[in-house]
C-alpha cells in the first residue's frame, strides 16, 4: 500500500504543475471512480448514494459522496486542503528584452522561498483564454520542457552572497527564455498561440489573457539511502489533496463524505473559489436546502483541515518548541494555536487522536514557539464560515514553500489510513 501510494503521489505531482492542472487531475481520478460533474449553473438532481463533484474557476473542487445514512442524523465528514502553492506568476505584459535575452516579468505568488528558484530548469503552465471563431474559450497548457532559467550571479561578482542576500523580485527574478537578435521583438502571446496549436491542435484567433506559472521540471522522487523521503515541488499542499482523495475513494461507508480542495490559500483564501469565499457553504446549502436542516446537519458534522506541518529540522531544531518537534515518518501532526490560527480544540483533537490510536497510526502535536508568529490554514476560515467543528492536522515537511520540499515516505500511508477511518466513522463526537 505504501509504495503504491507514494508512486501515485509522484505521478499526481507531475501532472499538477498549477492549481488548474491539480483540479483537472482530481477530476480525472474522480470520474474514473464513477463521480459525476454537477454544474453550478444548473439545477441539481442528486440521489442517495450518488457520487458527485463541483469545480469553480477550474482551480477548486468539492467531491461529495452522498451516504445512505441521513446527514441530518449522522453529520457530514469533511476533509479540506488547498490546490495552490507559492510560485512565480507571469505578468500581463511580461516581455523584457535586455542584453540580447528574452525574459519574462514575474510576480511572486504567496510566501515563496525565492533563493531555490535560481539555477533550476523551469517550465511554464496554466490557463489561457483566447478567441476562436468569434467565441471566447479557455484551455490549460503545459510546455513541459525546460524553457527558462534564472541564473545566479557568480560569486566573483557578489562576494557577500553567502553572508545573506536580499533578493529583489522585480530585478532579479525574471527568467531567461532565449537569446534574440538586436532588433528582433518577441510577442509572448504569439508563443502561447503556437503552444495551443502544438498541445491541443487548435488555432486561436488571438490570445486574450492567461494565468501562467513557472515550475521546476525536476520530477518528485523517493530519496535517501533507505528511501525514507519524498522530495518534490508543491507537496504543500498537493500531498494533502492526494491523501484526501485516496481516503475518499477508499471509504466504502454509508456516511456522507466531502473533500474540498480550495485555491488561493497561500494568498489569504479571499476569492470566489477560496476558503474565505462561499463555495463550500453554497454547495452544502444546495444539498440541504432547508435552513433548519442545514444548520442542524453542520452542527453534527466535523472538518479535518489537512495542510502540511513544520517538521523539526536537525540543523535548526531551536526553531521549534522543545516539547513539540514533529518528526518525519512519525505520523500526522495535530496543530494547535490558542490564538485561533488553527481551528483545533480539545474535542476535535481528541477525536482525531482517538482515530489514530484505533488505526495504530502514530500521531504528533505541534505548537509554535511562544516567541514566534504562527501561520494559518483554511481550517479557521472554514470553521468561521460554516460554524463546523474543525481539527487542523498535517504531515511533517522540510523546506515548506521552497521550489522543492521534503516529506517522509511513510507518512502518506499514515494519513490516508486515518482519513479513511474518519470517512468511515459511524459516530462523530
From Swiss-Prot:
Gene3D superfamilies: Aminopeptidase i, Domain 2, Zn peptidases. It comes from the Bacteria. This is Probable M18 family aminopeptidase 2. The lineage of its organism: Bacteria, Pseudomonadati, Pseudomonadota, Gammaproteobacteria, Pseudomonadales. SUPFAM superfamilies: Aminopeptidase/glucanase lid domain (SSF101821), Zn-dependent exopeptidases (SSF53187). InterPro entries: M18_aminopeptidase_2, Peptidase_M18, Peptidase_M18_dom2. Keywords: Aminopeptidase, Hydrolase, Metal-binding, Metalloprotease, Protease, Zinc. Its cofactor is Zn(2+). GO terms for molecular function: aminopeptidase activity; metallopeptidase activity; zinc ion binding. Belongs to the peptidase M18 family. It comes from Pseudomonas putida (strain ATCC 47054 / DSM 6125 / CFBP 8728 / NCIMB 11950 / KT2440). One of its GO terms (cellular component) is cytoplasm. Its EC number is 3.4.11.-. One of its GO terms (biological process) is proteolysis.
